[in-house]
């Protein structure tokens, strides 16, 4: 079993090295846009690493965006064996975790919340003028 600090160090190493590997070694033309690793969570036994990714640089509709994210996750999950092998060469540990890629929805949720706040701020003067009458 690994301690909390060790898990954090391992997650940070995996995130740093995977970011570099995806940028430099993964040459799939279907990976349009910038794939960013927003976080990594390593299981206590170091058997798995859940990798959370976002895709930036694509201006698409919501439906197209969802399809693009799914396609990106499929590409990354299919390349996970290669990425794990390369990762094991870069980080010198006895166990290299299996990689599971997930889409990180925090950016999308943040944009959604920002839109709601912006709409509320725009409606505020309208409501104040209605209250005065």
From Swiss-Prot:
List the record's Gene Ontology CC terms alphabetically.
cytosol
User: Its gene?
Assistant: rbfA
Native organism is Acinetobacter baumannii (strain ACICU)
Coiled-coil ranges from the UniProt annotation: none
* Family listed: Belongs to the RbfA family.
Function field: One of several proteins that assist in the late maturation steps of the functional core of the 30S ribosomal subunit. Associates with free 30S ribosomal subunits (but not with 30S subunits that are part of 70S ribosomes or polysomes). Required for efficient processing of 16S rRNA. May interact with the 5'-terminal helix region of 16S rRNA.
Query: What is said about its interaction partners and assembly?
Result: Monomer. Binds 30S ribosomal subunits, but not 50S ribosomal subunits or 70S ribosomes.
Q: Which domain of life is it from?
A: Bacteria
State the name under which the record lists this protein.
Ribosome-binding factor A
Keywords, ordered alphabetically: Cytoplasm, Ribosome biogenesis
Q: Note whether Secreted occurs among the keywords.
A: no
What compartments host this protein?
A: Cytoplasm
Gene Ontology BP terms:
maturation of SSU-rRNA
Molecular-function annotations in GO: ribosomal small subunit binding
């Amino acid at each position: 079993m690994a301690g909390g600090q060790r898990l954090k160090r391992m997650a940070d190493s995996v995130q740093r090295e995977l970011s570099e590997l995806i940028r430099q070694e993964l040459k799939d033309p279907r990976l349009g846009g910038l794939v960013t690793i927003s976080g990594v969570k390593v299981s206590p036994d170091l058997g798995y690493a859940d990798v959370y990714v976002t895709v930036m640089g694509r201006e698409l509709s919501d439906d197209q965006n969802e399809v693009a994210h799914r396609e990106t996750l499929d590409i990354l999950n299919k390349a996970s064996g290669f990425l794990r092998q390369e990762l094991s060469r870069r980080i010198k540990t006895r166990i290299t975790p299996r990689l599971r890629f997930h889409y990180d929805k925090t950016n999308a949720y943040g944009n959604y919340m920002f839109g709601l706040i912006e709409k509320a701020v725009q409606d505020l003067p309208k409501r104040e003028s209605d209250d005065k009458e």
